[in-house]
Amino acid sequence: MKILNLYSGIGGNRSLWGENHEVTAVEIDEKISKIYSYKFPKDKVIVGDAHQYLLENFNKFDFIWSSPPCQTHSRLNFANQLGGKYENRIKYPSMSLYEEIILLQQHHAKNKWVIENVIPYYTPLIQPSFSICRHYFWSSDFILSAQF
């Protein structure tokens, strides 16, 4: 299976996928991508913008995993903006999360995909497929194994 692992970090969930796949990982931080490459030497690692890479390459993969940055969606960040040390630094929630969900729902429906993010401080604009602990997941008609 050809897998696209976006915002890959040092690998996290990648260790659950086994070695029988052709994995392309995209990470913006070069230092972090080197750690990923060390842990998963068979994977192709791209240092770059995962959001843009998805837009340009989504149709080349059988399965896509995306875990976009959560900071602007998190309840902790929202609480800090209201009264914590970051007061008066309110930021818009990043809409890249919803851009990716819509892109994959409309243009990658025949293949498998999952987008993961924290449960936000607001009512989600698109209802998630399911939740686990503090995380929402939007997905194709794909069910994660209980091992996750």
Regions inferred by a protein language model and the residue ranges of each:
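Conserved active-site and SAM-binding loop architecture
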Residues: 1-148
